[in-house]
Amino acid sequence: MHPKIANLCLEKKCHFASTSYISPEIKKFDKDAKSMGLIFINEVGLDPGIDHFFSHLLVKDLDKQNLENISVSYQSYCGGVPATPNDFKYKFSWSPVGVIKALNSSSKFIKDFKESIVVPYKHISNYDINNEIFEAYPNRNSLPYIEEYMFPKNWKIEEFVRGTLRLKGWKNAWEEIFNTLEKKPENLDEKIKNKSDELWNLYQYKEDEEDRVILWVKL
């Protein structure tokens, strides 16, 4: 959808802004947009977006201290959850298909100075934020952001992960979905689509219903 909208913006000579990650398709519009004096900007939401801003501030602040031979641990976690927890520990503001498929797509990060690749739903752990326990898992490929956030080359990176937060109990509430992903049936896409329709009917946000967002960036 975003490439179609971006192309329409070029045709109409309009600026383009999106909260979504920069995709290869969107990158192709960069040259034309600049030549036309248009602003095409992505990743300007909470995550991705505000988390980038906090990350750059933390890196700059630590770098100014001119410390030598340091090991650093970077964590950035964000999540949107119901303001009033429900039995499913989650509600949907967009297609459940995308949420489920993201859980089944490999995530890449650094742990104990080593690169790790995991499937998110198999790597859920408790995460404490100001004495509130959430459940967390790594999201997408974190590694390009080491350069994006301009980590100095002399820093030894013990941990670098960007991930997602969920309410405590979310893992158990989603056990049926995880079991389906684990079994890898031939008609997995069909099962995901059917489950998505069911979840959308049961757990979509109502109009004007409040949610809660949590963002935690640590270095």
Language-model segments: which ranges?
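Beta-sheet entry/capping signal
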Residues: 14-15, 73
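Short, charged/polar micro-motifs that form catalytic or ligand-binding hotspots
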Residues: 19, 45, 135
